Structures are given as structure tokens and as C-alpha cells.
Amino acid sequence: GGRIMGNWTGFCVKYFLSTKIIIKGTENIIKNKKFFIAASHQSMFETFYLQTVFNSPVFILKKELLLIPIFGWYLKKIGSISIKRDKTTKDNLSFYSDISKLISNSNRPLIIFPQATRVLPNERPKFKKGASKIYDNLKIICQPVAINSGYVWPKKGKKNINKTITISILKPIEAGLQNDEFLKILEKNIYTELDFLN
């Protein structure tokens, strides 16, 4: 389901928006090891298309997104893990164990958006600490990804044509760093790349 939707998204972007999709840094993709993906988030594009770049990654998302017609069904279909953000609830008590179990029993990587919501192309909000908590609990490599999709498919306003979306796969961040150090490196690497892509 995820790959089909990702391929359809790529087709629509290429042929209806006359937009080129470039993937750079494929040599940095982690192979034969458990890892999770931390990607910048400017549009709905990456929610769908990254399913085709990586091996059908699993999303962590706000529980209310599952209530959106059709989109919520899609998120459930691809095995997303939902959480009530900023709350400690019974539903969230097994959060990290659910993720660890998923990573252990599957070849599918986890994907998170450290900005926590879609942002405009020139916005640079601080990354949320939830990203470092996942890094600390899972104790696996992080694959950073920078995507400048907001110029084509912005969170507000109409879509643009004759543009280029670049998906930049950055060098992995090894496990074992302190939480604050990891978050600082992740944020710096992704924003430096986005500044370059601009």
C-alpha cells in the first residue's frame, strides 16, 4: 500500500506539476543494520514518497491524524504508530517497547519528523526532544534526510509547477551519543543542507 501511494505521488508531482524529483546521497543509505530515519517536513510529499526511497518506513504520528478520512486509513494500512502528543496516557505506556519490537521483527525502518509538524521552507524551528528520546531508547543509527518539498507543495497556498524537489540523504549519525549532542548534530546537519538546497 505505501509503495503504491508513494509511486502515485511521484507520478503526479512529475507529470501534473512538471516537477523533477532528485535523490542525492544514496551512497549514505544504511545497509544491513537497524536504523531510523529523521527527515525534515515541509509538505505531504515526503509522507508518501519516502515509502519508495526506503523500505516502506513506519511513521510515528499524532493519534488524531488517524481520524482523517482516507488519509487516516492509509496511515493505519502502512502500520503507523500513533501517540497522544505531549501527554502520558495508558495508550502511550508501551510506546518505546512497541517501536523496539517493530524494529526487531521487521526490515522496515522507523521514520520521524523532528520538527513535529510541516513548516515553511525558510522556517527553522528547534527540533523536538522526542527525536532524541527515540534515539536514546532504540540505541540504533539515525539516517538524517533533508527535503525541500515546501517550494512545490507548501503547507499553505497553491502548489507550484516547474520546480525541483531534492531529497538529500545525509551521512548517518551513529548510536551512543548523549541526547543533547545528537539533537544538536541532527538539527545542524539537516538545516545546513536545507540552506544549501535553497
Locations of regions flagged by a protein language model:
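Catalytic core of membrane glycerolipid acyltransferases/transacylases, capturing the structured
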Residues: 1-7, 15-16, 31-88
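A generic structural signal for well-ordered alpha-helical segments
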Residues: 13-14, 75, 103, 135
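Short gly/ser/thr-rich secondary-structure transition/capping motifs
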Residues: 16-24, 92-94, 148-150
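A generic structural signal for alpha->beta connector loops
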Residues: 18-20, 56, 77, 107, ...
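Short acidic-hydrophobic, aromatic-tinged amphipathic segments that line or gate anion-handling sites
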Residues: 23, 81-84, 175
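Short, solvent-exposed loop/turn elements at beta->coil junctions and helix N-caps
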Residues: 26-28
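Non-catalytic C-terminal accessory region of glycerolipid acyltransferases
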Residues: 30, 93-198
